[in-house]
UniProtKB/Swiss-Prot annotation:
Name of the protein in question: UDP-glucosyltransferase avaP
Organism: Aspergillus versicolor
Any one Pfam family match given in the protein's UniProt record, by short name: EryCIII-like_C
EC number of this enzyme: 2.4.1.-
Similarity comment: Belongs to the UDP-glycosyltransferase family.
Length: 453
């Protein structure tokens, strides 16, 4: 991009983030690495996480208004469609598109302050993930917008880019191995949601109210919202590997795969009191470790955690159930089950034989990078695509539903524990991920964009 390297003391990296746990943790990991390498870093997020951000040595700036408030948290324990359709539409309108004006203003305020305090000699590189749309108004012609030297989109979902003949999770096209029937109906519904005039019209109205020129909003001029999130940047760095995605012969050069982040989450000051007893057991006491977790949003334990506990209560395994800030479980636990509110996955998965999860891109990428086979549930947002791709790679059994039956989980876990070929396949995938260094690649792009003419 440029032949003259800009020195680190001339570069200021701004990272935009929601304060949802999984997204903020990735911003902190990237920010901490940049700070360690000598860059100045400002992280924008909700006011409630100021202390977390400042604990890594980053400067903090608040996301304002809707961008800094409590994230939309649908009640995922509602019935299946049509409610599920309403949930996805609500999430797109209220969580992805609705906060764009406040995200834009928050970032522009920081850019203006840096220009006033540090001058034109400071090269600002901005990055965020697909949740944040702060740069979209800049690309579509917002009046008076300050444009940073470079814009990086960190890919924390499957690729949102539309492509000729290639399915994306936003277009509702399943992988070739996906069964028909209700799953096909689900994907058809998802396609209708993500390509609907309702969603696109809402996106256009938000931009129109921000003063985007009318010519830029004419039919055919404005790409679909999710596609915009993948293309309105100088570099889209997917936290995955090419083998996870369908090949795209027409993919723009801006799309690059950088592998999974090496860690997400900070090591807790003290692990559960039972940690050594379970993790470092020897001899007959050593059991295969099955971890079950539902993440921070879809955390109704009757969907997955409780059915898994029931399924494995008589099996010769050690079960670790993590709630990840979810509701308390008020049941008597079998003797082979241990409960924890939260243990960082980068620690826990290194000792795990099978992960039972409702999936999601970040969790699946970490498990793949560590060679851990999975039993996956979950169908909303990107989860069905993500989970079906993991299954297509040979690393998972995808149950393809939101609420599971104990007998189905039991069969899947036992199949994985007895399947040596699947274990070998997971180790092969782990070796693929080991070829990448996500943090170093992100640094390379920061340097390249800051140094471009």
């Amino acid at each position: 991009m440029g032949s003259i390297q800009t020195s680190k003391d001339q570069i200021h990296v701004i990272i935009g983030s929601t304060h949802r746990f999984s997204h903020l943790e990735k911003a902190k990991v990237i920010g901490a690495h940049l700070i360690k390498r000598g860059y100045r870093v400002t992280i924008l997020a909700g006011p409630s996480v100021r202390d977390e951000v400042e604990s890594i040595g980053a400067l903090f700036a608040p996301m304002q208004g809707r961008a800094g408030g409590s994230p939309i948290k649908p009640a995922y324990n509602q019935p299946p469609p049509p409610w599920a359709e309403e949930m996805e539409v609500s999430a797109l309108k209220n969580f992805f598109i609705g906060p764009i004006p406040d995200e834009y203003k928050s970032v522009q305020d920081v850019l203006k302050t840096l220009r006033e305090t540090e001058g034109e000699e400071t090269k600002v590189v901005y990055m965020d993930d697909i949740i944040c749309g702060a740069m979209l108004p800049v690309y579509f012609g917002a009046p008076g917008a300050i444009r940073p030297k470079g814009v990086i989109k960190i890919g924390t979902t499957p690729l949102p880019h539309e492509s000729a003949g290639t399915p994306t999770w936003t277009l509702g096209i399943p992988s070739p191995s996906t069964d028909s029937g209700s799953v096909g109906d689900l994907w058809g519904t998802k396609k209708e949601i993500y390509t609907s005039d309702d969603i696109q019209g809402h996106f256009e109205n938000v931009l129109r109210e921000m003063g985007i020129p009318a010519d830029n909003l004419k039919p055919g001029s404005l790409p679909r919202f999710m596609h915009s999130q993948g293309t309105c940047c100088d570099a889209y760095l997917s936290l995955s590997i090419p083998e996870f995605e369908f090949p795209r012969s027409d993919a723009p050069e801006s799309i690059q795969f950088v592998g999974a982040l090496p860690t997400v989450g900070s090591v807790p000051s003290n692990l559960p009191e039972w940690w050594d007893e379970v993790i470092h057991a020897q001899g007959p006491a050593k059991k295969p470790i099955v971890v079950v977790s539902q993440g921070a949003v879809n955390n109704d334990p009757t969907d997955l955690i409780l059915p898994t506990i029931e399924a494995l209560k008589d099996e010769d395994v050690a079960v670790i159930a993590t709630l990840v800030r979810g509701p308390k479980i008020e049941v008597d636990l079998p003797s082979n089950v241990k409960l924890a509110e939260f243990i960082p996955f980068d620690i826990l998965l290194r000792h795990t034989d099978v992960l039972v999860s409702n999936g999601g891109f970040g969790t699946v990428q970490m498990a793949l990078s560590l060679g851990v086979p999975m039993v996956l549930a979950g169908v909303y947002l990107d989860k069905y695509y993500t989970n079906s791709r993991a299954a297509s790679m040979g690393a998972a059994i995808n149950l393809g539903c939101e609420r599971v039956e104990p007998s189905v989980v039991k069969t899947a876990v036992c199949d994985i524990l007895s399947d040596q070929k699947r274990k070998e396949r997971c180790l092969q995938i782990k070796e693929k991920y080991a070829e990448y260094n996500a943090l170093d690649k992100i640094v390379d792009y920061v340097d390249a964009l800051a140094s471009k003419p």
